[in-house]
């Protein structure tokens, strides 16, 4: 949540710093949607594509709560996957 509060004013160019109920609900719904989508596609998308899609959603459609949630979930999950792959390949 701290990441959202830190990034939100930069992306939207305002002084709003706070997590609204809609953002939390959007993130929960987005987590379920992304989880189901990843299960259906069985991880066929590379992690960097997931990060690019997530960042694109944040920049283009960040004013909509559900799409913002999906963008954050995709970005966070993609970054986690990149870090996990880097650690497992370098060990």
Swiss-Prot record:
GO cellular component, one term: membrane
UniProt keyword terms in alphabetical order: Host membrane, Membrane, Transmembrane, Transmembrane helix
Subcellular location: Host membrane
Membrane-protein topology: Multi-pass membrane protein
Record-annotated membrane-spanning stretches: 17-37, 40-60, 69-89
Main subcellular location of this protein, as a coarse class: host cell
Name recorded for this polypeptide: Putative transmembrane protein ORF91a
Domain of life: Viruses
Paired cysteines (S-S): none
């Amino acid at each position: 949540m701290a990441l959202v509060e830190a990034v939100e004013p930069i992306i939207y160019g305002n002084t709003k710093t706070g997590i609204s109920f809609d953002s939390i609900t959007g993130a929960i719904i987005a987590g379920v949607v992304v989880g189901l989508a990843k299960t259906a596609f069985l991880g066929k998308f590379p992690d960097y594509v997931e990060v690019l899609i997530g960042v694109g959603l944040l920049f283009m459609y960040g004013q909509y709560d559900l799409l913002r949630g999906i963008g954050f979930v995709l970005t966070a999950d993609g970054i986690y996957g990149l870090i996990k792959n880097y650690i497992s390949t370098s060990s």
